Amino acid sequence: MKLPFCRAALLAAALGVCLVGCKPAATDEPAASATAETAEVAATLTPTAATTAQPVAAEIGTVLPATEDAGRSYLDETLFIGDSNTVRYTMYADETGTAFASVDNSIGVVSMGAGAITTLKCEKFKGSSTMYTVPEAVAMLKPQRIIICYGTNNLGGSSTDATSYIKTYLQGLQAIQTAWPYCDIIVSAIPPLDKQRENTNLTMTQVDAYNAALVTMCEENGFKFLNSAEVLRDAATGWAKTDYTLSDGVH
């Protein structure tokens, strides 16, 4: 039976269209320098001063531009972290039949929100029964880069105030950065909703507001932002493209 097309498949493919990173070192020692993605901010891990104006992505370089496909090696060198949308990266395959991600390079937890990054013990390793938080697991995995996506489970009601969401998300990102400061951290956009969704309390107005807040957060703290939502969104309607979500209209 042919599976319905899920946005996770296209999103995972789009993740390869980031700036090309360097290959991971053969040892556990940290790389001598940052990759091209964050070289301009790697010299200091302290946040830059907050700006009062909306950042211009083309000038500050926060939003990653489209590039040529970086290939399979880019995906394999990347640790994907997130909620059920990330879980689905292991369920969908590319044209060769290879899953976009595996248990070796993904930490995905169904229904997880940004506030649980530092508290939820959600990862364990082969041969051990000990559970680890995301930052703890990252320190053990020592990835070349991270693409992280939380936010779908932080949506609720009709408020467009992303203050609490950004605060907890930033705390999680900083904890990851402290645990393993030798990798690039790329924050992926909250994916768009289907107009025909089960939970009508969730709106694209809120998604857009939260994503705009993510761009500002990334700019102020030296992270990169991957606008993955643009490949999933119908420019004419503002909602997710037809047939790019499951029956609930959210995933």
Question: Where are the model-predicted features located?
Answer:
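Structured segments of extracytoplasmic/periplasmic soluble domains
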Residues: 84-88, 92, 137-140, 172-179, ...
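Catalytic His-Asp segment of secreted/periplasmic serine-dependent ester chemistry enzymes
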Residues: 192-251
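Active-site segments of SGNH/GDSL-like serine hydrolases
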Residues: 149-153, 175-208
